[in-house]
A protein has these predicted regions:
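Eukaryotic intrinsically disordered, low-complexity regulatory linkers and tails enriched in Ser/Thr/Pro
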Residues: 1-16, 20-90
Length: 90
């Protein structure tokens, strides 16, 4: 069973996502949120502050998923590391 452990100290979240049942992982630009869709229902994973762009964070999460999903059944995505990388590149 494929699982993602999503954690972020800045936003105080620790979430385990079962990828078997997921229909969609994406972002809502106007709300600056990252969400998942399970069986037609949308659940917000992360509400970001304006300086942390949901599009960029979501792209990094999807890249991590693509890079790890073929070789590992479960893996951790640390959103703090993604945010640090984004802000260091500014």
């Amino acid at each position: 069973m494929k699982m993602i452990y999503l954690r972020c100290k800045k936003y105080k979240i620790n979430k385990l996502i079962n990828l078997k049942n997921i229909d969609e992982l994406g972002y809502k630009e106007f709300e600056n949120t990252i969400y998942v869709r399970f069986h037609g229902k949308v659940y917000t994973l992360l509400e970001l502050k304006p300086e942390d762009k949901a599009e960029t964070v979501c792209t990094h999460i999807l890249d991590e998923y693509i890079n790890n999903s073929m070789t590992m059944d479960s893996f951790t995505i640390d959103v703090d590391d993604i945010l640090k990388e984004i802000h260091d590149n500014k």
